A protein has these predicted regions:
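A short glycine-rich, hydrophobically flanked beta-strand micro-motif that places a catalytic Asp/Glu
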Residues: 37-41, 165-171, 233-237, 303-314
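Short, charge-patterned binding micro-sites
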Residues: 40-58, 315-319
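Alpha-helical support elements that line or immediately flank enzyme active sites
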Residues: 12-31, 129-150, 278-302
């Protein structure tokens, strides 16, 4: 029997994502000037105010205020009427040095034996539903949000858009787990004041269906995904009505509160650890990336149509406690899931330092992951320019 499955995404202007982006921008700034920096940076955003908290060990000083303000303005919070404006919001820093107890437990004479920065379990997931091996419901929800932000920043169409928005996509699956059709699309977007509420709702709905969705479909190159779009999709556009008050003024935002949006949209599993603001010595982030790297490559190689990989660590210990694999009965090789896990253990070095080297996680690459998902991204080389507290500028290919 067929079933329905939903995933949501949020825009870069969602308050929790504003916090994530500030935290990762600060992390990148540290890594640009000190690749050995240890960073655990949390951000809190609310009406007219940002608080930056956490623990850092680094040989460099960075201008937290400028980084936070530039991030907020890039997102689009540039008007006083939003009650949260990158030019005028208050910014308080409560950053302090990382615990010496943790440093002693993690650092080793032999760098390769660097211990995990914490205990925990991390998951990676992949499916062959899409070209980037992500669940199609989440992939579409992200695409809707990133395209809406693109339209907003162009400033030519849907000129009433404000930065905060959310999407949700419900997909119908066959009983053998094949996507069949899109059942429902939900889009809620912050907007300017309208003279009349009924006019507002009608206009936004019309523009979502006639401007946003055609552009979204135009970006999809996979015919199997395009076939999911039928004439019977149910659209819910701003279903609560007026959405003028939004962003950090409407809801307080915190780093690390969108971990399902950041990963697999409810598919697979999640170990509970957030990513943004953490350098790669924190296995919450680096091992989750490694688990995804393994799952994706296993599915891409045809080992299974779908795979979940779990890795767990003890603080201060380099090698993982376990590797677990679940192929959901969709394996294409004559091996049990346990045998696949044993093979993975031999093929991949999952010590934290080895993960850093393999995935190049000591580069300032994290700001790009802080909105629209950490997984399923297209590899690219990008030039990034950083300016130090002493006005020294450097450009890095990452």
């Amino acid at each position: 029997m067929s079933y329905l499955f939903s995933s949501e995404s949020v825009s870069e202007g969602h308050p929790d994502k504003v916090a994530d982006q500030i935290s990762d921008a600060i992390l990148d700034q540290f890594l640009a000037y000190d690749e050995k920096a240890r960073v655990a940076c949390e951000s809190f955003v609310t009406t007219g105010q940002v608080v930056i908290m956490g623990e850092v060990s680094s040989r460099v000083y960075i201008d937290l205020q400028t980084i936070a303000r530039n991030t907020i303005k890039r997102i689009g919070y540039t008007k006083a009427e939003y009650q949260f404006d990158g030019n005028s919001c208050g910014i308080l820093s409560a950053i302090h040095e990382q615990s010496g107890d943790i440093n002693r437990g993690v650092d080793r004479e032999n760098e390769d034996e660097q211990g995990a920065g914490d205990q925990g379990m991390m998951f990676g997931y992949a499916t062959n539903e899409t070209d980037n091996y992500m669940p199609v419901s989440l992939d579409l929800a992200h695409l809707i949000m990133s395209t809406l932000a693109e339209i907003r920043k162009e400033g030519k169409l849907m000129t009433y858009l404000r930065p905060d928005s959310k999407s949700q996509v419900t997909v119908q699956y066959s009983d053998d787990n094949i996507p069949e059709r899109i059942d429902t699309i939900v889009v809620s977007t912050q907007h300017d004041e309208f003279a009349d509420d009924d006019t507002m709702l009608a206009k936004i709905r019309e523009d979502v269906i006639n401007i946003l969705m055609p552009r979204v479909k135009g970006k999809i190159t996979n015919d199997n995904v395009l076939k999911l779009f039928g004439d019977d999709i149910k659209y819910y556009v701003n279903p609560t009505g007026k959405f003028v008050i939004g962003g950090p003024h409407g809801d307080t935002g915190l780093t690390g509160r969108k971990i399902i949006v950041d990963t697999y949209g409810g598919k697979g599993a999640h170990g509970g650890g957030a990513f943004s603001g953490k350098d790669s010595s924190k296995v919450d982030r680096s091992a989750a990336y490694a688990a995804r790297h393994i799952a994706k490559n296993m599915v891409a190689a045809g080992v299974a149509d779908e795979m979940l990989v779990q890795i767990s660590y003890a603080i201060g210990v380099a090698r993982p406690m376990n590797i677990y694999v679940n192929t959901y009965g969709r394996s294409n090789v004559d091996m049990t899931d346990g045998e696949i896990a044993k093979k993975i253990e031999k093929l991949f070095d999952l010590r934290p330092k080895a993960i850093e080297r393999t995935l190049k996680l000591r580069q300032p690459i994290f700001s790009e992951t802080a909105a629209y998902g950490h997984m399923g991204r297209k590899p690219e080389i990008k030039k990034k320019t950083f300016t130090s507290h002493y006005h020294e500028t450097k450009t890095i290919d990452v």
